[in-house]
């Protein structure tokens, strides 16, 4: 006889905000915390599609720029125009959607990292 034990919420990959510049392990962009009342600390991650991406305060982007991790939870412009395993996505417009207290900001992007 076998016993099947279901582990709650064990289907999700564990993740963290990227702390490695140019990381090939980035698989999405933080969207929001799941604030339900369970005991699990879940977050929503946006992958393929369109979403805003947070850009480092010292980085200026243009529409068409490819983005990679800056290693501090924000993105920077990729060194070339070739979509790579480290590419997060492409900037759709440089119009800032939100600016944070640390002067980082978000812009709309097409995401490639899902």
What do the predicted segments below correspond to?
Residues 1-114:
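Extracellular receptor-binding modules and their adjoining Ser/Thr/Gly/Asp/Asn-rich linkers
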């Amino acid at each position: 006889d076998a016993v099947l034990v279901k582990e709650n919420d064990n289907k999700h990959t564990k993740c963290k905000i990227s702390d490695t510049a140019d990381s090939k392990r980035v698989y999405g962009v933080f969207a929001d915390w799941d604030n339900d009342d369970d005991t699990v600390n879940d977050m929503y991650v946006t992958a393929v599609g369109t979403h805003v991406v947070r850009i480092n305060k010292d980085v200026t982007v243009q529409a068409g720029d490819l983005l990679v991790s800056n290693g501090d939870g924000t993105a920077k412009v990729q060194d070339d125009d070739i979509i790579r395993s480290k590419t997060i996505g492409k900037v759709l417009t440089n119009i800032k959607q939100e600016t944070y207290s640390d002067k980082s900001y978000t812009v709309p992007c097409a995401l490639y990292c899902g």
